[in-house]
A protein has these predicted regions:
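A polyanion-binding, active-site-adjacent surface
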Residues: 1-87, 91-102, 108
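Charged phosphate-binding loop/patch that engages nucleotide di/tri-phosphates or the phosphate backbone
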Residues: 109-123
């Protein structure tokens, strides 16, 4: 069975020139998708607000209505996971793929999490 996958990020980064340069976060996310044998996925952010956001900046109705039709939902980081939990959406929480995320320095733990996510996608 082919899964329809939605990945939920937090919000756009602050750099207005990000679209013109290499985006290490998206590059890492795409490498992970390759590891999961995922060729296509949809992506949305919790909010379009740049910079630091809070739960009040999230359009929960938009997130909830967008999730409909997807059978696998993946949250990037704790904020996105909290948003999905608040609206009772089952999901898998991945660490945020930003190069600034120090949790990714533990290669053994990251490998375990990525293997677990692959199993979630293909179950």
């Amino acid at each position: 069975m082919t899964s329809s996958i939605l990945i939920l990020g937090q919000n756009p980064g602050n750099n207005p020139k990000a679209y013109h340069y290499k985006n290490h976060t998206i590059d890492r996310l795409n490498k992970w998708a390759d590891l999961f044998d995922v060729k296509h996925y949809s992506f949305i952010n919790c909010s379009d607000v740049r910079g630091e956001i809070k739960l009040k900046d999230v359009d929960f109705n938009y997130v909830q209505s967008t999730v409909i039709g997807y059978n696998k939902v993946i949250a990037l980081g704790g904020f996105s996971s909290a948003v999905l939990s608040r609206i009772n959406i089952m999901h898998f929480r991945l660490p945020h793929p930003s190069p600034r995320n120090r949790a990714l320095n533990d290669k053994a733990e990251l490998s375990r999490i990525l293997d677990e996510c692959k199993r979630y996608i293909h179950e």
